[in-house]
Amino acid sequence: TDIPSLISFSDIENVKIPDEKARELVHGYYACISYIDAQIGKIVEALEKSGCLNNTIIVLWGDHGWHLGDHGLWNKHTNFEQATHVPFLLIDPSSPAQKVTTPVEFLSIYPTLCDLAGLKKPLNLDGESLVEVVKGKKDVVNIKPYAVSQYPRVGKMGYSLRDGRYRYTCLLYTSDAA
């Protein structure tokens, strides 16, 4: 998906950043990742010490990825894979550990937590519960085989559909999007 017109998803001018500044930005990004990893470790350690780890559902996710010079961008606001493919971790102590690589939507987090906690879900709730996936009873593709991302720009709207293998992205100009 290295299509030149997709660069216009960014409102930030496409200016060449000097190599030294680029290294500094990448270093800062990795420092942030290391810092948050340490903070998560502190939370898990506190849950363990308090005896709550085995009855606590842990959910970690990032709201977007980040461009570190790929596609000539140094930001987060695009429909490129680097911005929409984000970390998502859900640990339910009563469920088997597993790794799922099929994309899911953030809309599914709330209904999943409602089901895991035994709470009644509100009517007309967006998103599909992934509780059957978390419990190891179903594959994500049996619930929803794709994830959708949408990103508006001035005068444009970008859409992406992603499954486990393919991604389709389109850019519609405002007059086309109506």
What positions do the PLM features span?
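Active-site-proximal cap/lid insertion segments
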Residues: 1-103, 116-123
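Active-site/binding-pocket entry motifs
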Residues: 14, 154, 167-168
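Polar, surface-exposed loop/tail segments
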Residues: 54-56, 94-161
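Residue-level detector of short, conserved catalytic/binding motifs and their immediate flanks
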Residues: 86, 159, 166
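Low-complexity, glycine/alanine/valine/leucine- and proline-rich hydrophobic stretches
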Residues: 164-172
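Conserved small/polar residues in nucleotide/adenosyl-binding loops
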Residues: 173-178
